[in-house]
From Swiss-Prot:
GO cellular component terms listed in the entry, alphabetical order: cytosolic large ribosomal subunit
PROSITE patterns the UniProt entry points to: RIBOSOMAL_L18E
Gene this protein is translated from: RPL18
Localization in the cell: Cytoplasm
Job description of the protein: Component of the ribosome, a large ribonucleoprotein complex responsible for the synthesis of proteins in the cell. The small ribosomal subunit (SSU) binds messenger RNAs (mRNAs) and translates the encoded message by selecting cognate aminoacyl-transfer RNA (tRNA) molecules. The large subunit (LSU) contains the ribosomal catalytic site termed the peptidyl transferase center (PTC), which catalyzes the formation of peptide bonds, thereby polymerizing the amino acids delivered by tRNAs into a polypeptide chain.
Main subcellular location: cytoplasm
UniProt protein name: Large ribosomal subunit protein eL18
Disulfide bonds: none
Short name of any one Pfam family annotated for the protein: Ribosomal_L18
Organism field: Candida albicans (strain SC5314 / ATCC MYA-2876) (Yeast)
Residues in the signal sequence: none
Classification via InterPro entries: Ribosomal_eL18 (IPR000039), Ribosomal_eL18/eL18-A/B/_CS (IPR021132), Ribosomal_uL15/eL18 (IPR021131), Ribosomal_uL15/eL18_sf (IPR036227)
Amino acid sequence: MGRDHTSKQHVRSGHRTAPKSDNVYLQLLVKLYSFLARRTDAPFNKVILKSLFLSKINRPPVSVSRISRALKQKGAAEKTIVVVGTVTDDNRLLEFPKATIAALRFTAGAKDRILKNGGEAITLDQLALRAPKGQNTLIVRGPRNSREAVRHFGFGPHKGKAPRILSKGRKFERARGRRRSRGFKV
């Protein structure tokens, strides 16, 4: 007798197993961290490897002001900051502490600021030589939901989400449901 196939057969995993990018430098980092993730028992390397697989949208840039805030945490001043993404400058920040920062890439302004304050800007492969198990490190991630597009996601009543509109003016999207004087306001 045949067997009922009640569950779906070839269920595709929603997780990436490699980066989508063809960047050879990224592929070298993946090769390095997949080796470290396999051969060491440290979860740090697994986290870095998974982060290297992410799309650019899910690897938002981290500003130096966010890093300086992270360094103010208790016991974080001597740690190496790890960013799987870009480190960007923030000219609103007046002083920046001396720190060692490992990242995929740095903008010119951010690198200048780090080096000017006596810090170090290193790459992730240099970090692997210094801390193969991620000892004395602190991973910092950027804000994923700060993109303009996220303002429109999950549209519905009382969500306070922005409608997708072609024109932004006094007469557009401002009638019933948007003003007390026009029936009601959500």
